[in-house]
A protein has these predicted regions:
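Catalytic domains of lipid- and phosphate-ester/thioester hydrolases
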Residues: 1-139
Length: 139
């Protein structure tokens, strides 16, 4: 989202002209905690900023780890933002993290270490064919 559009949206939320919540990929649920309010589960600000926000967005396929972490992050941010800013409008439903096996920061840091790196011809089927390793052609 462009800076001016984000500023306009947040100004409308603050003035009461609009109701809503905003969250960005480089944010973390801890940023939505109010003094004395509930704590929200989620990834750390450092993990969100340093790895999740840097996952390439060049129409390349995501690895299973990238897809799982991005989905978890979206769910967790939406939960925190809407509980903080839209509590009256929410329909209560228990939070179910889509991929609970992908909540460990060390595991994520290892799996997403090169996720910001763009690969010539991508990581899709053509990349798999050109990659050295076991043949994908059946005997």
């Amino acid at each position: 989202m462009q800076v001016v559009q984000k500023r306009w949206l947040l100004a409308n939320f603050t003035s009461g002209l609009m109701a809503g919540a905003y969250w960005g990929i480089d944010s973390a649920p801890v940023h939505y905690q109010l003094d004395g309010g509930p704590t929200y589960p989620g990834y750390t600000p450092a993990l969100a900023r340093d790895l999740i926000a840097t996952i390439r967005t060049n129409y390349d396929v995501f690895s299973d780890a990238e897809a799982a972490v991005l989905e978890n992050h979206g769910y967790l941010l939406a939960e925190a933002a809407t509980r903080t800013h839209l509590a009256a409008e929410r329909h209560e439903a228990p939070l179910q993290i889509p991929h609970p096996g992908w909540m460990s920061e060390p595991k994520i840091r290892e799996a997403l270490g090169d996720s910001s790196r763009q690969v010539f011809l991508g990581r899709g089927a053509l990349h798999a064919l050109l990659r050295p390793g076991p043949s994908i052609v059946p005997d």
